[in-house]
Amino acid sequence: MDAQDIESRHPLIGARPRRRALRSLSILLAAALLLGLVLFYANGTGSGTAVDPVRVDNEFPWTNDMLAWQRCGFHFRTVRNYMNDPSGPMYYKGWYHLFYQHNKDFAYWGNITWGHAVSRDLINWQHLPVAVGPDHWYDISGVWTGSIIVVSEDRVVMLFTGGTKSFDQSINLAEAADPSDPLLLKWIKYDNNPILWPPPGIVRDDFRDPNPIWYNASESTYHIVVGSKNDSLQHTGIALVYLTKDFKKFDLLPTVLHSVDKVGMWECVEVYPVATTGPLLHKAIDNFDVDRVLDRSTVKHVLKASMNDEWHDYYAIGTFDPIGNKWTPDDETVDVGIGLRYDWGKFYASRTFFDPLKQRRIIWGYIGEVDSQKADIAKGWASLQGIPRSVLYDVKTGTNVLTWPIEEMEGLRMARKDFSGIKIKKGSTVELSDFGDAFQIDIEAEFTISKEALEATIEADVGYNCSSSGGAAIRGTLGPFGLLVLANQDLTENTATYFYVSKGIDGSLITHFCQDETRSSKANDIVKRVVGGTVPVLDGETFAVRILVDHSVIESFAMGGRTSATSRAYPTEAINSAARVFLFNNATGVDVIAESVKIWQMNSTYNDFYHF
């Protein structure tokens, strides 16, 4: 294939070196600021009157065809209306269960219930009636996130967060009316709810998302974690732990499990074990069975929290002492809220569960919308769940976990097209064609830069940052390079998934994995960002990426799942048969080889009501 001249044909992808582009950007920003100040005072809004940043006359005129195209083919989604946090995922009596936050009446947040769906294989889902809804004073504003615990063959309990009329938060109990029912259709709330209120010193709307983290078999006691914060300290995120034997009476442990200053409210807190060596290395460990591991030195514990201040899921690897109620990070510089993320994009409120069927841990996270509420109402639904991912310890780096689409996703692959040995010259693009529609696909790609080219580069972009360095349009010595998906023919619409390599004066290399949404749509009433972070690339490894494109969702995984980035894309032209895939190399100093690119068409899954 012949590479095409990116500078002459596609100036939006990058026609200038980085410094000149930044200087031009600064001039544009200054002009925009001056114009904004003139309009601000001319319109008399300096008094503090709130102004809607998206004016009605700026809303994009979406057509029914465009909106219908956005609905995904193989992601978990509601049949209609709104969803957010996953809750209580589990495997029970032959069925995978997923509960989720759901407004069954409208395509926006409010009137939150627990939606409920079941599956035999984690990819085809049947939606059941709502499990529980807001029908008591303690949950009248919503039945919010929580968890499910299978206590015994005769008892399955649900712990959920309730919101009062004034949005005070409490922890509440419901139980499966018939534990012998594999579908768990009916739930009964406890007569004496709430079972927990925020303890002294905790604000009444900063207390939520109960989740079991350990079972002390010798004392028949469950340890339940609840997320919170303490603003009397330093805007500190904290994890509180309660002990219970019967889920009706709870005792708060006197010390917090862990806390981190200046990160704000912790939501959806989890602690779970990962094997670091030994026979369980490639399998998961159940929280309730971790004490059966003979050599505890082969196990680490992940602490994860969803940061309410910024809506990202952070995690860290460390040591868990359940008796002393203490979790300690291996590395304080990458503690929870300041270090590692599961995903740098639109992925939040994640929950994991142990799958006894395949001895694995699976993580769910919800993917919200970034368009206007008006558009969501018009299309009749909003938000979805990310692809279920397996979670394993990364034995090669020893510093992170790997999250990767579950193996069942490969069963959706259909026709495949292979490309190999494509040289992508500096400042060029290469269209990948002849594989059918490009909006419901699975891509695996590997790139290399010659060792000689890397060694010849003295220093390159040591201060690079995905979110603030200009995205795929800004050219550097060793990047960006990667793929453009959901692209139209002239590349005025595309989402770029790419690597960017920085080199220090000492010869050290840092690889950034980024996803640029800024040209994903010509619509102007959606949020478009550049997301991403650094990712370990070890000696001898290629730059490897997997991208799952499912209409308006793009989930990308770098280096076998060491990091990932999820984006919502709402193209106006690059839809249906107009969607394209390109390779690109916007580096100024090196050519890049696409050693291997494999693209599969993906089948759709069943996602509809259960037929009784």
UniProtKB/Swiss-Prot annotation:
Compartments annotated for it: namely: Vacuole membrane
Report the record's Gene Ontology biological process terms.
carbohydrate metabolic process
PTM characteristics: Might be processed in two N-terminal and C-terminal proteolytic fragments.
**Disulfide connectivity?**
466-514
Induction cue: 6G-FFT activity is induced by high sucrose under continuous light. Both 6G-fFFT and 1-FFT activities are strongly inhibited by HgCl(2), AgNO(3), p-chloromercuribenzoate and SDS, partially inhibited by CaCl(2), MgCl(2), MnCl(2), FeCl(2), CoCl(2), ZnCl(2), SnCl(2), CuSO(4) and EDTA, and activated by sodium deoxycholate, triton X-100 and tween-80.
Activity dependence on pH, as recorded: Optimum pH is 5.68 for both catalytic activities. Stable between pH 5.0-6.3.
> What Gene3D superfamilies would the database entry show?
Exo-inulinase, domain 1, Glycosyl hydrolase domain, family 43
E.C. code:
2.4.1.100, 2.4.1.243
Q: Which residues are glycosylated?
A: 111, 216, 230, 465, 586, 603
InterPro entries the record matches: ConA-like_dom_sf (IPR013320), Fructan_Metab_Enzymes (IPR050551), Glyco_hydro_32 (IPR001362), Glyco_hydro_32_C (IPR013189), Glyco_hydro_32_N (IPR013148), Glyco_hydro_beta-prop_sf (IPR023296)
Report the membrane topology from the UniProt record. Answer: Single-pass type II membrane protein
Q: Which residues lie on this side of the membrane: Vacuolar?
A: 46-612
Q: Which residues bind substrate?
A: 82-85, 101, 109, 144-145, 208-209, 267
Q: Which residues lie on this side of the membrane: Cytoplasmic?
A: 1-24
Q: Where are the transmembrane segments?
A: 25-45
Q: What is its main location?
A: membrane
The family classification in the record reads:
Belongs to the glycosyl hydrolase 32 family.
Under what name is this protein listed?
Answer: Bifunctional 6(G)-fructosyltransferase/2,1-fructan:2,1-fructan 1-fructosyltransferase
What's the source species for this entry?
Allium cepa (Onion)
